[in-house]
Amino acid sequence: MKQQWQFLILCLLVLFLTVDSRGRRLLSDDVNDTALLTAFKQTSIKSDPTNFLGNWRYGSGRDPCTWRGVSCSSDGRVIGLDLRNGGLTGTLNLNNLTALSNLRSLYLQGNNFSSGDSSSSSGCSLEVLDLSSNSLTDSSIVDYVFSTCLNLVSVNFSHNKLAGKLKSSPSASNKRITTVDLSNNRFSDEIPETFIADFPNSLKHLDLSGNNVTGDFSRLSFGLCENLTVFSLSQNSISGDRFPVSLSNCKLLETLNLSRNSLIGKIPGDDYWGNFQNLRQLSLAHNLYSGEIPPELSLLCRTLEVLDLSGNSLTGQLPQSFTSCGSLQSLNLGNNKLSGDFLSTVVSKLSRITNLYLPFNNISGSVPISLTNCSNLRVLDLSSNEFTGEVPSGFCSLQSSSVLEKLLIANNYLSGTVPVELGKCKSLKTIDLSFNALTGLIPKEIWTLPKLSDLVMWANNLTGGIPESICVDGGNLETLILNNNLLTGSLPESISKCTNMLWISLSSNLLTGEIPVGIGKLEKLAILQLGNNSLTGNIPSELGNCKNLIWLDLNSNNLTGNLPGELASQAGLVMPGSVSGKQFAFVRNEGGTDCRGAGGLVEFEGIRAERLEHFPMVHSCPKTRIYSGMTMYMFSSNGSMIYLDLSYNAVSGSIPLGYGAMGYLQVLNLGHNLLTGTIPDSFGGLKAIGVLDLSHNDLQGFLPGSLGGLSFLSDLDVSNNNLTGPIPFGGQLTTFPLTRYANNSGLCGVPLPPCSSGSRPTRSHAHPKKQSIATGMSAGIVFSFMCIVMLIMALYRARKVQKKEKQREKYIESLPTSGSSSWKLSSVHEPLSINVATFEKPLRKLTFAHLLEATNGFSADSMIGSGGFGDVYKAKLADGSVVAIKKLIQVTGQGDREFMAEMETIGKIKHRNLVPLLGYCKIGEERLLVYEYMKYGSLETVLHEKTKKGGIFLDWSARKKIAIGAARGLAFLHHSCIPHIIHRDMKSSNVLLDQDFVARVSDFGMARLVSALDTHLSVSTLAGTPGYVPPEYYQSFRCTAKGDVYSYGVILLELLSGKKPIDPEEFGEDNNLVGWAKQLYREKRGAEILDPELVTDKSGDVELLHYLKIASQCLDDRPFKRPTMIQVMTMFKELVQVDTENDSLDEFLLKETPLVEESRDKEP
C-alpha cells in the first residue's frame, strides 16, 4: 500500500512540476526522464524473474544513465532503451516511453509483453522501434506508431499475435522510414490494394510474411516503390494468376518472396522479369503453379543468386537459357514433376552453384558425371527420383579440393558399390544413399572422414561390418543408420568413443556378439536400435547411464540374463531436444506373432511414402500401420524413455518395479521371453502407455488393478502366461479381445468366462486319531442329503429356463431377418438373454433378445440409416422409449477392435453436441451399439431433401445454430477429451438433429484415439467420404485434427449454399462444391455461393459472407493455415451476439480431465 501511495505522489509530482501555467519547465529534463522510466517499470512490468531491472531505483541522486539497458546523450538525456531478452512480463503501456522526448531507439524484443494502452501520447521521437517476439495482440498499436512516430526509420512487430486487418501505412509526413516488419502475426482479411503504395518512397524493406492476409496479388498497387529492395508476402493466403504491373516499378528490388501462398496458373513469362535488374533472391515455392518453367525467367540471370520454385506442379525441365545464370548459387526445384536431361545440359554449367535441391521429381537416367564440374557444390539433393546406374565417383577428384558437405541420393534405383572416392571428400558431413540397391562394403575411407556426422545407408544390400576404428580419431558421428542391410560381425568397443552419437540404427542385419557396455558412455544417445540380429549376452545395465535415451529396441536377438532395472534409472530426468525435428516413420506391427517386435523406426528424410509401403518390413506382415512426421518431445525436463522393445529374446527373472516410473513410456514390449514373477502394481504409473505386451512368458499372480487407470492403453497382450484371478473391471481392460488373455488357465472375467461364484477352496486339516467315526458318518449322510436336494432344485430350474429359452428362440426365429447383412448366430454359445452393457442406469436390464424384439429381428423396415461401419435401426423398447441401434459390419481382423475403440471413445464422453452411446452388446460375431435416438435424423436428409413432401426448411437462424453446435461438438472431441479424438469421417450425414434441432456429432465408427502413440494416424485405406476428404489425405494417408476441420468447412459450406458436396448435375463430373465455391470466392463472387433462400432472410447476406469466410479458412488446402476448432468457435463468438436460447458461446469451456462428463443441461 505504501508503494502505491509513493507511486501516485510521484505521478502527480511529474504532472504538476513538469510545466507551470505559463509553460515554463520547473523540473529538470533528467528528473523527468527518471520519472517516466520509473512509471514504465511500475505500470508495465508485472514480473521480472531474473531481476533484470534490479538497479532501476528511483530516488535522490539516482542517475538513470547507469540503469541497465539505458543509454544517454552527453548532456544526460535518455536516448536509448535496450531491454531485449530480459524475461520481462507485463502489459505494455508504450506512451510512458514515447513521452521520453529524446528517446531515439527502443528494443523490447524477446520478452512477454501483452497489449496495453498506447493511445494518449502527445508525441514520439523514436527512430528505431523493435517490439518483436512478445505477446502483443491489439493491432491498434501499429496504427498508433505509424501515425505518431513521424521520425521512424525502422519498426519491427514480428512474432507477436497481432490480429485483425491491415489498415494504415505510415503517415505521409514520415519521409524517413526504411524498414517495416509485421511478419509472423495473425493479420487476416484482404490486404488493402494501396497498402503498399501508401508507404513513403523511402521504404526499403517490407515483410508481411507468416500471416493470413488474402486478396488477389494482381490487384495490389506498389506505387513508385523506387527504393524497395526486400519484399516478402510468404506464408499467407494470397491468390491470383497474374503479377501486378506496378511491381515492375520496383527497379531496385533484390529479394522477392511469395512462397507458400495460393498463386495459380503459370509462372509469368514474356519480358516481365526484364524489369528487375537487381533481383538476387526469388522464391515462388509452395504455390499452385503448373506448366513449364518460362525461359524468360532467365532474364534475371545477370544478378540472380537464389531461385526457389519448389513445391509446385511444374513439368518439363530447366530451360537451356539458364546456362547464362553465372551468379546463381542456390537452386531449389524440389517437389515438382520435372524430368529430362537438364542436369547435364544446364546445371552442370553453373559454375558458382553451391546448393542444388531436386528431390521428389521424375528425373531418370544416370546421375550425370558432369555434375562434378560444379566445383563449388556444397549440397546435392537428388532424393526420390528415378535415377539408375551407379553413384558417381568423381565428386572429389584429386584435381579439385571438393567442398561437398551433403550428398543425398536416397530413394532411387542405384546399384553397384559405394565409391571409395567419396573418402576424398574431406568436407563431407552427411551421406544418405538409403533405399537403393547398393551392394558390397562401405569403404573404410568413408568411416574416417574427419567431419562426417550423418552416415545413412539403410535399406540396401550392403555387407561387411562396423570397423574397429570407428570414432577412434574423433567423435563427430551423430547418426549411424544402416538398418535393413546384410552387415555381419560384432559391434566394436570403439563405438563408445562416438561421444556425439544421437541415433544408432543397425536393426535387421546379421550382427553377432555382445552389446558393448561402452555404449552406456554415450550420454547424448537418444535412439538405439539393434533389433532382429543375432546378438547374445546380457542387456548391459550401463545403458541406464545414457541420459537422453528415449528409444531402445533390442527385439528378436538371443539376449539372456535378467532385465536390468537400471534402464529406468533416468526416468524423470531425460531432457528433450537431442533428436528434435528429424524426419521419421514408424512402421507398427499389428499382425500378431507373424511379425516380430512392436514395429520399426526408420529415418524418413527424402523417402516417398509409396516406396515405404512396398518395403518388405511393411508388406510382409499381415497388418501394419505407418506413422510419419517430425520427432517431437512431449515433455520439457522430466522425461523418460518412450519406447522399449526387448521382445523375442531369452531374458529371464522378474520385471523391475522401477519400470513403472517411466511416465512417458508409450510402448513396452517384453513378450516372448522367460520372465517370471508378477506384473508390478507400479505399472499403474505408465500414464502414457499405448502398447503393453507381456505375452509368452511365465508370469504369475493377478493382473494389477492399477492397469485399469491407463487411459491411453490401446493394445494389451498378456496371453500365454500363468496369470490367475479376475480381470479388473473398469478402464479398458475388459475391452480387449479374448485372445489377449488366452492361455492363462487361472484368468477369468470379461472377456473370458465369468469367475466362479463358489467359495474358494479351504485348507485341509488333519483330524485327531480318536475323532468319533460316528460323527463323521453322520456328517456324511447330512451332506449327501443336502446335495440331493440341491441337485433336484437345480434340475427343476434348468428345465424351466430351457423351456423359456425355447419359447424365446421360437419367437425370434419367426422374426424377419435383416435385409442389410446376415446374422452369424449358428455357433453362438451365449444365451440370447445376455445383458447389454450400458452406460445409462435406465437401460441396465436390457438384453440382446430385447433388441431383437424391438427391431423386429433387425428387419429392413426398422432400418433408418446405413454408414461405412454398419446399419442403424430404430428400436422401440418395452417401456416405450426409443433408441437407435448400430449393428457393426464384420471386417476381418478389424471388427472387434473397431467395436472396442468406439465403445471406449464414445461411452465415457457426455456432451450436449455429441450423440451419446447408451450401451453395447457383443454376441457371437455380432457387435451392437445402442445410441440415444435423434428425432429429426441427419442434417444431410433435412437440408437436401427439404423439397420433398413434409420436408423441413431450415432458415438461417436454424442453420447457424446447427453450424455452431456441430463446431462445438467437434471442438470438444479435439481439445477436451483425454486422449483427444479425431473423427475421420465428419460429414452432414454424421450431424444428427434432436427434438430441439440441436446438432449432435455422431458415428465414430472410423474414429481413432489420438493416444501417445497415435500422434498422426495412418491408415491403409483412405479415410472419409468423397467430397469431405481434405487434399493431404490423398498424399500422406495421415488423419489429423486439421483434416476434420476441412470436413467441417464442407459442412458449413453446405449450410450456406444448400448444395451437396458432390453433384455432377450441378458441378460437372470433374468438380465439386468446394472447387466451385473456391473459384467464385477467388473471383470476388462470394454472394453467388449463398443459398438464395437465405439471402432474403432478415439477417441479410453480410453475416452470411462472414460465415463464408470462416468456411474458406477451414477449407484451405494447406493444413497449417486452417484454424483449430477452438479458433473456429472464437470466430463464431466474435460474429454472433448470442441471443438465442441455450446457445451461449461465451460459456464454451474446455475441461482437460481423463474422463470428461458434461451434463446436457449445462451450457458448453
Curated annotation (Swiss-Prot):
LRR repeats, residue ranges: 77-98, 102-123, 125-146, 151-173, 176-197, 202-224, 227-248, 252-274, 278-300, 303-325, 327-347, 352-375, 376-397, 403-424, 427-448, 451-473, 476-498, 500-523, 524-546, 548-570, 640-662, 664-686, 688-711, 712-734
GO cellular component terms, A-Z: plasma membrane
InterPro entries per the UniProt record, alphabetical: BRI1_island_dom (IPR045381), Kinase-like_dom_sf (IPR011009), Leu-rich_rpt (IPR001611), Leu-rich_rpt_typical-subtyp (IPR003591), LRR_dom_sf (IPR032675), LRR_N_plant-typ (IPR013210), Plant_RL_S/T_kinase (IPR051716), Prot_kinase_dom (IPR000719)
Residue window of motif Cys pair 2: 748-755
Protein kinase domain segment(s): 858-1136
Tissue: Predominantly expressed in vascular tissues. Expressed only during postembryonic development with a very discrete pattern of expression, preferentially in the two protophloem cell files at the elongation zone of the root. The expression in these two cell files attenuates as the phloem cells differentiate in the upper root. In cotyledons and leaves, it is expressed in phloem cells, starting at the cotyledons and shoot apex, moving toward the basal part of the leaves, where the expression is weak. Expressed in the secondary and tertiary veins and in the upper part of the cotyledons and leaves.
Molecular function (Gene Ontology), one example: protein serine/threonine kinase activity
Active site as annotated: D985 (proton acceptor)
Glycan attachment points: 32, 96, 112, 156, 212, 227, 257, 362, 373, 461, 532, 558, 638, 722, 743
Signal sequence region: 1-23
Topology feature Extracellular, residues: 24-772
Keywords (A to Z) from UniProt: ATP-binding, Cell membrane, Glycoprotein, Kinase, Leucine-rich repeat, Lipid-binding, Membrane, Nucleotide-binding, Phosphoprotein, Receptor, Repeat, Serine/threonine-protein kinase, Signal, Steroid-binding, Transferase, Transmembrane, Transmembrane helix, Tyrosine-protein kinase
PTM info: Autophosphorylated on Tyr and Thr residues.
Record PTM Phosphotyrosine, positions in chain: Y931, Y1028
Record topological domains on the Cytoplasmic side: 794-1164
Residues recorded with modification Phosphothreonine: T847, T855
Chain sites annotated for binding ATP: I864, G865, S866, G867, G868, F869, G870, D871, V872, K886
Source domain of life: Eukaryota
Biological function: Receptor with a dual specificity kinase activity acting on both serine/threonine- and tyrosine-containing substrates. Binds brassinolide. Regulates, in response to brassinosteroid binding, a signaling cascade involved in plant development. May be involved in cell growth and vascular differentiation.
Family: Belongs to the protein kinase superfamily. Ser/Thr protein kinase family.
Written domain comment of the UniProt record: Contains two pairs of conservatively spaced Cys (Cys pair 1 and 2) possibly involved in forming some heterodimers. A 70 amino acid island between the 18th and the 19th LRR is essential for the binding of brassinosteroids.
Protein name, per record: Receptor-like protein kinase BRI1-like 3
Biological classification of the source: Eukaryota, Viridiplantae, Streptophyta, Embryophyta, Tracheophyta
